[in-house]
Amino acid sequence: MKRLLILTALLPFVGFAQPINTLNNPNQPGYQIPSQQRMQTQMQTQQIQQKGMLNQQLKTQTQLQQQHLENQINNNSQRVLQSQPGERNPARQQMLPNTNGGMLNSNRNPDSSLNQQHMLPERRNGDMLNQPSTPQPDIPLKTIGP
């Protein structure tokens, strides 16, 4: 009777007891010690967090590289534009005087600006058939005999 009384007194505390883990039975294959399970869970959580941090770092690094490349392209484009003769910034261009009209001046004869004579006589079709004005020396041809 005394035992029954003690048992009934302890009955309300049974609800606080940890339930038996039927999934992790030491007699079943694949049994894991609970402390190893906790450690494995913690390691998996840590790996997930590290993966997230690495992905964030990769994203940031990619954005920085993209910005750097865009800046380089813009700088190079500006350099090319500034080095070209028809620069788009007229404030930085030096205007040269055009006193004689240049190539657009149509008052002059284009041949008179050369003031040069042709060194070779002018040729026409069939000129090679005509005899030259200076006689050519007669050079006997060497014949090859038997």
From Swiss-Prot:
N-terminal signal peptide: 1-17
Keyword Signal set for record: yes
Biased composition range(s): Low complexity: 32-54
Keywords annotated in UniProt: Signal
Span list, region Disordered: 27-54, 70-146
Superkingdom per UniProt: Bacteria
UniProt keyword Signal present: yes
Pfam families for the chain: DUF2756 (PF10956)
Biased composition range(s): Polar residues: 77-118
Family annotation (InterPro entries): DUF2756
Identification of the protein by name: Uncharacterized protein YhhA
Source organism (scientific name): Escherichia coli (strain K12)
Lineage: Bacteria, Pseudomonadati, Pseudomonadota, Gammaproteobacteria, Enterobacterales
